[in-house]
Amino acid sequence: MASSTDVRPKITLACETCKHRNYITKKNRRNDPDRLEIKKFCPNCGSHQPHKESR
């Protein structure tokens, strides 16, 4: 299956304010070695909030 050294692993994005895990996406480890942070819409908060990569 997927190894831990996969170049494009699946990650979960969690809202910064309410901590709900709203989005699942993939990222390229070579281009983005740090934890990803994107501003996306949170349906629980009802507004655009920063979402961070959760473990």
Swiss-Prot record:
Top-level taxonomic group: Bacteria
Keywords attached to this entry: Ribonucleoprotein, Ribosomal protein
GO biological process per UniProt: translation
Coiled coil: none
A single Gene Ontology CC term: ribosome
SUPFAM superfamilies, sorted: Zn-binding ribosomal proteins
PROSITE patterns assigned to the protein according to its UniProt record, in alphabetical order: RIBOSOMAL_L33
Listed GO MF terms: structural constituent of ribosome
UniProt xrefs under Pfam families: Ribosomal_L33 (PF00471)
Family: Belongs to the bacterial ribosomal protein bL33 family.
Protein name (database record): Large ribosomal subunit protein bL33B
Organism: Mycobacteroides abscessus (strain ATCC 19977 / DSM 44196 / CCUG 20993 / CIP 104536 / JCM 13569 / NCTC 13031 / TMC 1543 / L948) (Mycobacterium abscessus)
Phylogenetic placement of the source organism: Bacteria, Bacillati, Actinomycetota, Actinomycetes, Mycobacteriales
